[in-house]
A protein has these predicted regions:
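Hydrophobic h-region of N-terminal signal peptides that target proteins for export
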Residues: 11-19
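Mature extracellular/passenger domains of Gram-negative fimbrial/pilin and adhesin proteins
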Residues: 2-3, 19-182
């Protein structure tokens, strides 16, 4: 799973519109003032955490037919050099292409190009609370280094479980994690 992050940017656009008359003809004059302020991010992402790969290894289809989903695979987002005078909270969310049959979960792409596999990938907190795509989880930051643990899991689509038609083979998916500081 490829996970990336973007930068924080605040853009303020102020537009002043005025009319001026010259020789009896009205002209529209528009002055646009742009102020761009790049904010200091309170934390840096630990080197190597910009791209997180998760390998599920071999998943036996019979396991999914019995349990509907796999046990969560842990991964961490490590933030370093946090300055809580800038912000003491972070909201973490995940985005990607959603599986239409498993709301809030990522769709997967079969490596063989066989079409729909019948599974999705979900995110959850370390304690097992489901995190739908685009939903933010709020966390308090500590001065210095912070580590946030999450799980991803593979879940079968209900109709594929009933029909026992999960396609076998390798698959991939990607998501982006977002950090929003308060």
């Amino acid at each position: 799973m490829n996970i990336k992050i973007g930068s924080l940017l605040l853009l303020l656009i102020v537009s002043d519109i005025s009319f001026a008359a010259d020789d009896g003809i009205a002209y529209l004059q528009q002055e646009i003032k742009v102020k761009v302020e790049v904010l200091d991010e309170p934390c840096d992402i630990a080197p190597g955490d910009e791209l997180i790969n998760i390998d599920y290894g071999t998943i036996v289809d019979k396991y999914l037919y019995i349990n509907t989903r796999t046990i969560g695979e842990k991964f961490k987002i490590n933030l370093i050099d946090c300055d809580i005078s800038i912000s003491d909270r972070v909201a973490i969310s995940f985005s990607g292409i959603e599986n239409s049959k498993l709301p809030g979960m990522l769709s997967v792409i079969p490596m063989s190009g066989q079409g729909d596999v019948g599974i999705g990938i979900g995110f959850e907190t370390e304690s097992g609370e489901f995190i739908p795509l685009s939903d933010e989880k709020q966390y308090k930051l500590n001065e210095g280094d912070n580590s946030f643990t999450f799980n991803t899991f593979v879940q079968a689509e209900i109709d594929r479980l009933i029909a026992r038609t999960i396609k076998l083979g390798e698959f991939e998916s990607s998501a982006i994690f977002h950090l929003n500081y308060d």
